[in-house]
Regions:
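Short helix-loop "hinge" at the ATP-lid/N-box region of the Bergerat-fold HATPase_c
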Residues: 193-194
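Conserved catalytic submotifs in the C-terminal HATPase_c
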Residues: 137-140, 159, 164-173
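PAS-family sensory/regulatory modules and their coupling/dimerization elements
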Residues: 1-58
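Conserved glycine-rich
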Residues: 265-266
Length: 287
């Protein structure tokens, strides 16, 4: 408190010298720190001060989010861009006479171009969620009907890996939520399960409902996630060493899932054991 009073006195002294002045102050609160903007003006006629205090915590939070986003983009985009540039220069130089080697370079360029495209799409979606402040458009929908639409859109991915899907979602579950966000959440989680599942394995979908919430479980038979990495899988751009070595991806899908789930008033969690697969749980309010 003394520190804050000193800051205010310093501001008023500066105001006396310049007629007006501004200063920022951070106050420790129980839930989170508060960023305040103090604006002071001298009233010459009465020799008094007018002090206006504005809470700019949300503004500072948005600024920090944008800084982090730009930092993430500049860091993560370097790798695919470097591969595309180096591969293109090598091909254009005519140094590769072997067709098979040239084909590998071309495939690498294509893969990294696709990764770059996916990354930009996911980043734009994340930015829209974090900065738009849009209110979810909640309407009644049948959960099974929406999940069946998602499964149909992922059939080609499952066919490539000969993956079976056991869908035990009840046809009676009806909730009020944002349909587009719901589809994005479940599509990302099911696609993620397909990506990290071995060929010929099974993915299971289950649901349970309470008086207020619905919980959807997506279980795979993949390698699993190390215990020390469980609390990081929803971080932006985070991918485990195992994932980086064996699968393509941007590291943004689960971060997008978390942002959308939180936006709908729910949460997402994961349980996993090495060599026993992973289970993701999405809890959403019924209304």
């Amino acid at each position: 408190a003394n520190k804050q009073l000193q800051s205010i006195n310093k501001l008023l002294k500066k105001t006396k010298e310049n007629l007006s002045a501004e200063a920022e102050m951070t106050i420790k609160a129980k839930s989170s720190d508060k960023n305040l903007l103090l604006s002071a003006t001298t009233m010459l006629s009465t020799n008094e001060y007018i002090l206006v205090i504005n809470d700019i915590s949300s503004l500072r939070k948005l600024e920090n989010l944008r800084k982090n986003l730009l930092s993430d983009i500049s860091h993560e985009i370097k790798t695919p861009v470097s591969v595309i540039r180096a591969g293109s220069e090598t091909l254009n130089s005519g140094a590769l006479e072997d067709k098979e080697t040239a084909k590998k370079f071309t495939q690498s360029i294509q893969d990294n171009a696709e990764r770059l495209s996916e990354m930009i799409e996911d980043l734009l979606e994340l930015e829209k969620i974090e900065f738009s402040g849009l209110v979810p458009n909640k309407k009644k929908m049948n959960v099974l009907q929406q999940i069946n639409i998602i499964i149909d859109s992922l059939q080609s991915l499952m066919f490539e890996k000969n993956i079976q899907l056991n869908n035990s979602i009840s046809s009676e579950h009806v909730i009020k939520t944002d349909k587009d966000s719901f589809r994005t959440i479940l599509s990302n989680l099911i696609a993620n399960a397909i990506k990290y599942s071995p060929d010929g394995s099974t993915i299971s979908l289950k649901s349970s409902i309470s008086e207020t919430d619905i919980t959807i479980e997506i279980a795979d038979e993949g390698y699993g996630i190390e215990k020390q990495n469980l609390n990081r899988v929803f971080d932006r751009f985070y991918r485990t060493d195992k994932a980086r070595a064996h699968t393509k991806g941007t590291g943004l899908g689960l971060s997008l899932v978390k942002q959308l789930t939180n936006r709908l008033g729910g949460n997402v969690s994961v349980e996993s054991k090495i060599n026993k697969g992973s289970k993701f749980f999405v809890r959403l309010p019924q209304k």
